[in-house]
């Protein structure tokens, strides 16, 4: 159902898996990967969101790498620069905001495990992200630097 697309991020180009609903338009959501990378489960979730009427995008935060081995997944996670991941997520939000198929007033963001943490953090990364859901997040706040000031007052 979906396809790999490229979008601007980190002063270069990032990739992600995009699926558009059969109706051709709908609100947009970012789906953030688990520890394993952009694997079949994540692309299936993106396709299911599209099946429910959403324009869905999963950015590839490991840039082409994925695994089913726990030790390798931990290595990939430890090598993930949170500032680069943040820019990839913000880039995905900007990309979705500019898609003609996006009929929403903002972007939603969901994630699983590592992605659950990043989904919750994403609301502080881009003003376009207006709703987040983190499924079983592990919150490595020491590796993140959320800016909560935009929610003050």
Annotate each language-model stretch with its function.
Residues 4-102:
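Serine-hydrolase catalytic machinery in alpha/beta-hydrolase-like enzymes
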Residues 1:
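Cysteine-centered metal-binding/redox modules
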Residues 90-151:
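Primarily recognizes the serine-hydrolase "nucleophile elbow" in alpha/beta-hydrolase
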Residues 77-80, 149-153:
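A catalytic-pocket lid/entrance helix-loop region that shapes and gates access to the active site
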């Amino acid at each position: 159902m979906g396809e790999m697309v490229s979008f601007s991020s980190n002063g270069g180009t990032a990739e992600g898996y995009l699926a558009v609903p059969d109706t051709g338009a709908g609100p947009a959501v970012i789906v953030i990967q688990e520890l394993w990378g952009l694997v079949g489960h994540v692309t299936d979730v993106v396709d299911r969101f599209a099946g429910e009427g959403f324009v869905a995008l999963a950015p590839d935060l490991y840039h082409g790498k994925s695994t089913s081995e726990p030790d390798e997944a931990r290595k990939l996670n430890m090598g993930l620069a949170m500032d680069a991941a943040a820019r990839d997520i913000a880039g995905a939000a900007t990309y979705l905001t500019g898609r003609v198929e996006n009929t929403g007033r903002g972007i939603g963001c969901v994630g699983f495990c590592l992605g659950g943490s990043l989904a919750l953090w994403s609301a502080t990364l881009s003003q376009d992200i207006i709703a987040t859901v983190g499924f079983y997040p592990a919150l490595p706040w020491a590796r993140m630097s959320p800016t909560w000031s935009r929610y003050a007052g």
